[in-house]
Amino acid sequence: MDGQILANSIVTLKGTDLRMVYALLLKTNIGHLLSSKTKDVISKLSKEESDNFTYHLEQEVNKLRNVEDQVLQVDLFLEITRLLKLRGTKYTLEQEIVDQSTFIVKDVYQLLLKQDKQFKSFAENEWNSTKLQQMIKFQMSKLFNELDNSFKDFTIDDQTKFASQVNEYIQGLPEEKQRKIKEKLGVDDLTDEMIRKAIATSGSSIVFAIIVEVSGFAFYTTATSLLASFAGLFGITLPFGVYTGLTSTIAVLANPLFLVPVLLGGGALLVNHQNKSLKKKLMPIIVMQITLPFMSQGADDVSFDLFIAEWNRRFDAYCKLQIELENEHAEGLKLQRNIRETKEKINYMNSAIHNEEQKIREEKKQIYYALKSSNLEDLGINGDFQKNRIEYQYINDRIQSLQQAKKVDAVNDSFFRRIGNKFSNLGTTFDIKSEEKKMNKYLYLMVEDVLKSTSSFKQIERERIQASKCNLRELRQSKNEKMTYKNSLESLLKQVNQNQSSIRQDIKAMEKQNYGLEHLSASSQQLLPTSEEG
């Protein structure tokens, strides 16, 4: 029952009522309260009337004028579930909203039991009322208790005016209910004077409780209107006369008994903790402010359609992001697999290129050693070969001359000459090695000349080298193509990774703005397994 009432109250809360509650819960923090109280104190010192906290709420309400009701309703509902740390669920059916609302009432009820020790004994005496009714009655009763002393300070004329408006409400009730109120108040007649005396002697809290018991919660609307009308006398200042629904809340927030525990709850510097403490402290008040309009006046046609449509819009957008992320992830895996396979092919080509290059080196060695052991003058390769052969033979002759000179010096047995010859032979040895390098160079040049020729000399080796070179060209071309392909894949993968990062940020933003989405699976549209919280 309580869950249904709260759910109905949320989807029927509209206009300024909705925006004031929204501003109070989502647009108010400990800084606003402290700043407002400070400004009020300064104003009092200068003997100026002000209510800066109410002004803050009014400003926030004005900012929300163009926001659709269902958007604010869903935001408000999700914020309550976030503060209570309820597990998120789908809200595609009315019953799902009602079930979650039932959990909200139960949790807020427990919060109020912890926050106010008086509530336990009050609830025990209200055993025939639901948890939701107990919370509302208790909070309104506390407010009226605060006003009892103020009422005694009214002039008789003001007391009579106040009682007259209360009596006007009673006179509008059926006669049977009027009779019950007379019995419970112990009066013979329901006149303005009798009501005034009853309030003056028993207190507004007792009188109002009797009226609510008989007539229902509709009287609270009249009571809050009365508070607005007599706000100046009660010490409550409202700069806007049209809206009166938050009168009780403003009075509670202005009470030091509410503010001081919040400030002390987390230490002077723990602002975030203070804000959470403030919002938790506000939860019973918020639930009361949400439900009072519906419980007092009811609604002819309660429809969840707009609320559900707004939730579905958000959930569909969330599912779309999740699906996009899954698709990007799958694309990323596909690209990684293609990159890995392409790298393997490139490695295979590098190995094949190395093998072909090794074959060419081996075949060139065969030609090299064949030239070294052949009579070069008998080989008619080509013109370049003949030029290089002449240089090669010239260097070879010079090496032989140097070696012969070393032998002549070696047979001289004079002591000093032998010492001189050792230095001379050392220089000759260096000269020989230098000439051998030159000769080797020309020998390799002749190998290249053979490869360029059409001679029958080492034709098989030459053909093998040509075949290997052809294979090399094909392999290198294929490798370049694979490298280009790999680079394009890596570029695509980089873009996919960036897309995934961007989508994850969008998902996180949606989860932050819409508590409970992180508990849902977009692909299966089922609840995800509960993870252990640290």
Cite the ranges covered by each PLM segment:
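Short, charge/polar-rich alpha-helical segments
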Residues: 317-353, 381-392, 427-433
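Extended, compositionally biased accessory segments flanking or bridging domains
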Residues: 307, 318-319, 326, 476, ...
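Solvent-exposed flexible segments
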Residues: 171-175, 179-182, 199-223, 275, ...
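Membrane-engaging insertion elements
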Residues: 223-314, 437-445, 461
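Long, amphipathic, heptad-repeat alpha-helical coiled-coil stalk/linker regions
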Residues: 246, 356-482
